[in-house]
Amino acid sequence: MLPSDHPMHRLADSDYLRACRGKGHERVPVWFQRQAGRSLPEYHAIRGAGSILKTLRDPEVSAEITLQPVRRYGVDAAILYSDIVVPAECIGFGVDVVPGVGPVIEQPFRTTSDLERLRPLDPESDTAHVLKTVEILVDELTIPLIGFAGAPFTLASYLIEGRPSRDYANTKSLMLNDPGLWHQLMDRLTDLAVASIRSQVMAGASAVQLFDSWAG
């Protein structure tokens, strides 16, 4: 149950949230995938060089980057500036996002012993900076904020491959040759995603999305 002062209540009649619920709306609401980020000159001015994960640890900067496309384009929803590997990085799995490459894993997931490296997420301590970013945003926004997490298959593909891949050979091999371990990994990553998006909603996000880039 959401608290009575949750932003979703005051924004319930926005075109975006009405569309999310399958209700009628005055016009088609619009937001853009990756609207916060590389396409905006003001993003590059504030972002600087280095890993995105360093930027994401600063709630004020992350909130500002989230707000930039809202000011520029007048979109109907803001999407949190973050990355799907953040929860895994925050529980100590050894993840970085290398400019020009993408997520790179220090020690890729390979065996049953690697499950021990995927402990449960405690959002209040592990991703406190993410929740602070959400809180800053909902105080400023007059439109819904979308939170998100990586869906289990896509996050697993990064953790197993160790970096972006063209054929996901290691992922397919694990699925086919050790289905028991694969399902245990899916369970751990499902719990990780649920804990992450639930905490974002409780912090003030009005909608959430799972990104599953490699499932298709």
Identify the role of each PLM range.
Residues 109:
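Membrane-interfacial amphipathic helices and adjacent loop/beta segments
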Residues 19-35, 75-105, 124-167:
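Glycine-rich, aromatic-flanked loop segments that form ligand/cofactor-binding clefts
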Residues 128-216:
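Active-site loop segments of alpha/beta catalytic cores
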Residues 1-95, 99:
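N-terminal basic, low-complexity leaders that serve as flexible interaction/assembly modules and, when applicable
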Residues 49-55, 94-105, 113-124, 160-186, ...:
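Glycine-rich tight-turn/loop motif centered on a GG-T
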Residues 65, 103, 206-207:
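Short, intrinsically disordered/low-complexity patches at protein termini
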Residues 51-75, 120-138, 180-195:
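Glycine-rich anion/phosphate-binding loops
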